[in-house]
């Protein structure tokens, strides 16, 4: 097969993820690859929260345009940045094994969320993290924090924040695990849908390529991600609402935990459901939570 061109964002984390996929394709499928890097609107507009400027799709559009114009064959993403609905003609072709899905508490002064003094300033731009943090500690001050991992860490080191919240997976992949002060338990902060999973996006029409990429697919990641994304799709959730979902696979049984919260964290609804059909499980849990008032909570 001809060389595969992989579209990637320019950040260190994006390139780590893309090189991980590139190496697997070359080693396991014996197909040569090259990486084409590009800036996305999500990388350029850093002075506003994502939920105010168009959401997670801002990290993908330029990569998808490259695929449509035959400048790239596939794109690599963090699954948590992929909206529940892809543009027509695109599909998720392969799911990589999941890294630690938990949120990370990072601080130079305090050992855990519990150690933070009243009024401590915590940096995150995620409504999901903000809502759950405020639900657990309503005496904290949450301030927006955008930029790549290195930018966020430097803002912490410069004293702009007492602590920041990041995805553990990104820090682990960039060999910055020593910066993690506390892996936040999922009981306190339920992860984002797909957090910790790297995914390959491709064009549906490219059957030959899809067949080959499928050989790299991690069944466990695919099944838990499908359950989490089905839940999110049924709720029609994006980055403008506080939604979390995390699934675990044991034999063939999937345990799906989900959370919706008001942006101030005062109202929160958590539920858990077990099943063996990931799509059905995600939809059923979402419907149960809708019946319990999920939409009212998200709107408040």
From Swiss-Prot:
E.C. designation(s): 2.5.1.61
Similarity annotation: Belongs to the HMBS family.
Pfam families: Porphobil_deam (PF01379), Porphobil_deamC (PF03900)
Gene expressing this chain: hemC
GO molecular function (one): hydroxymethylbilane synthase activity
Record's catalysed reaction(s): 4 porphobilinogen + H2O = hydroxymethylbilane + 4 NH4(+)
GO CC terms: cytoplasm
A Gene Ontology BP annotation from the UniProt entry: protoporphyrinogen IX biosynthetic process
Name this polypeptide is given: Porphobilinogen deaminase
Alphabetically ordered keywords of this record: Porphyrin biosynthesis, Transferase
InterPro entries: HemC, Porphobilin_deaminase_cofac_BS, Porphobilin_deaminase_N, Porphobilinogen_deaminase_C, Porphobilinogen_deaminase_C_sf
Cited function: Tetrapolymerization of the monopyrrole PBG into the hydroxymethylbilane pre-uroporphyrinogen in several discrete steps.
Assembly and interaction partners: Monomer.
Modified sites of kind S-(dipyrrolylmethanemethyl)cysteine: 239
Annotated cofactor note: Binds 1 dipyrromethane group covalently.
Reported cofactor(s): dipyrromethane
Main enzyme class: transferase
Pathway: Porphyrin-containing compound metabolism; protoporphyrin-IX biosynthesis; coproporphyrinogen-III from 5-aminolevulinate: step 2/4
Note: The porphobilinogen subunits are added to the dipyrromethane group.
């Amino acid at each position: 097969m001809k060389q595969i061109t992989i579209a990637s964002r320019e950040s260190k984390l994006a390139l780590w993820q893309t090189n991980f996929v590139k190496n697997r394709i070359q080693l396991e499928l014996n197909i040569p690859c090259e990486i084409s890097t590009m800036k996305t609107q999500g990388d350029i507009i850093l002075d506003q929260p994502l939920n105010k400027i168009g959401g997670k799709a801002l990290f993908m559009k330029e990569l998808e345009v490259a695929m449509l114009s035959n400048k790239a064959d596939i794109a690599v993403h963090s699954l948590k940045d992929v909206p529940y609905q892809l543009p027509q003609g695109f599909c998720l072709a392969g799911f990589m094994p999941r890294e630690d899905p938990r949120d990370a508490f990072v601080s130079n002064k305090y050992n855990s969320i519990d150690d933070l003094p009243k009024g401590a300033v915590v940096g995150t731009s995620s409504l999901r993290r903000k809502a759950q943090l405020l639900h657990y500690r309503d005496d904290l001050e949450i301030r927006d924090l955008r930029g790549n991992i290195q930018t966020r860490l430097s803002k912490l080191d410069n004293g702009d924040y007492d602590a920041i919240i990041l995805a553990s997976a990104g820090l682990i992949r960039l060999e910055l695990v020593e910066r993690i002060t506390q892996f936040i338990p999922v009981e306190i902060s339920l992860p984002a849908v797909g957090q910790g999973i790297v995914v390959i996006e491709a064009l549906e029409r490219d059957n030959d390529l899809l067949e080959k990429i499928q050989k790299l697919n991690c069944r466990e990641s695919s099944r838990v991600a499908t359950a989490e994304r089905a839940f999110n799709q049924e709720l029609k959730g994006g980055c403008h609402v506080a939604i979390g979902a995390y699934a675990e696979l044991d034999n063939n049984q999937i345990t799906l935990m989900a959370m919706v919260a008001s942006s101030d964290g005062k109202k929160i609804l958590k539920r858990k459901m077990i099943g063996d059909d990931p799509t059905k499980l995600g939809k059923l849990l979402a419907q149960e939570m809708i019946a319990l008032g999920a939409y009212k909570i998200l709107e408040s």
